[in-house]
């Protein structure tokens, strides 16, 4: 038996709470097995294909999103497990879904200033990202020319970055990034541009919580972090850097 996100108690703030999972015996006595904090994101992060796998250690599931924007498979803790199990029971293996909404729980982070770019540089960067996405899609289909082009692009990028690192800081070269962090498969180190920013309050501890919508390598998702653990002043256009526990829900 699992409490849904709407039933999870207690509710600590806007979209923030604790989900409890456990067993209900014949006397309707609930005994919990584990509980996890959650943070519900907003909007849509990706329309890419998603596969779901059960964790070995407990009754929980992770989603694997294959989005070409980042070039790696993103693994996230599945928030709407009961909804997924219900859809699987009704539809078998042919589960239909529309999109994925990701979110990140973070303990601490740093605010960085944005990289100064001209309109022409922004346009060229968008074109490069679009072309790379097309090449990645073609490479996944087995196109040898696309694979070769990606390899040459990576070599060229490595060479350019190595030269610039002699006189520049890495955070003036890299706008945003997302990469695995630690030994858990759903932990990531991220840096993204702040698109939206607001404050909410933990109703239990009365602590202020920063909620930021980030653009991380073209992926848009919300991150929550305690305000007192953020070094710097968050603002739209600046960048946030931190380590997150990536969660998400599949929109059926």
What are these regions (language model features)?
Residues 1-2, 7-9:
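Short, small-residue-biased leader/transition segments that mark boundaries at the very start
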Residues 10-182:
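Long, hydrophobic alpha/beta structural blocks
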Residues 181-193, 238:
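Short coil-to-beta-strand transition motifs
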Residues 195-223:
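OB-fold (S1/OB) nucleic-acid-binding surfaces
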Residues 227-242:
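Short nucleic-acid-contacting surface segments enriched for D/E, G, S/T with interspersed K/R
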Residues 245-252:
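Short, Lys/Arg- and Gly-enriched loop/turn segments at beta-strand edges
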């Amino acid at each position: 038996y699992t409490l849904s996100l709407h039933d999870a108690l207690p509710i600590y703030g806007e979209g923030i709470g604790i989900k409890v999972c456990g067993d209900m015996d014949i006397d309707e006595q609930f005994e919990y097995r584990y509980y996890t904090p959650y943070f519900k994101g907003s909007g849509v992060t990706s329309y890419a294909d998603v596969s779901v796998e059960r964790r070995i250690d407990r009754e929980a599931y992770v989603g694997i999103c294959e989005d070409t924007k980042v070039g790696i498979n993103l693994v996230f803790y599945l928030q709407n497990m009961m909804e997924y199990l219900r859809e699987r029971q009704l539809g078998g293996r042919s589960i239909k879904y529309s999109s994925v909404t990701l979110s990140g729980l973070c303990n601490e982070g740093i605010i960085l200033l944005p990289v100064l770019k001209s309109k022409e540089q922004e346009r060229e960067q968008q074109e490069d990202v679009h072309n790379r996405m097309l090449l990645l899609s073609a490479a996944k289909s087995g196109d040898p020319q696309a694979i070769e082009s990606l390899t040459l692009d990576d070599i060229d990028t490595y060479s350019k970055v190595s030269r610039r690192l002699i006189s520049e800081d890495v955070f003036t070269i890299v706008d945003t990034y997302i990469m695995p962090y630690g030994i858990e498969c759903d932990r990531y180190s991220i840096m993204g541009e702040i698109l939206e920013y607001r404050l909410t309050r933990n109703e239990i501890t009365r602590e202020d919580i920063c909620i930021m919508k980030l653009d991380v390598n073209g992926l848009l998702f919300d991150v929550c972090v305690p305000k007192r653990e953020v070094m710097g002043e968050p603002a739209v256009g600046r960048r946030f850097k931190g380590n997150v526990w990536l969660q998400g829900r599949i929109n059926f």
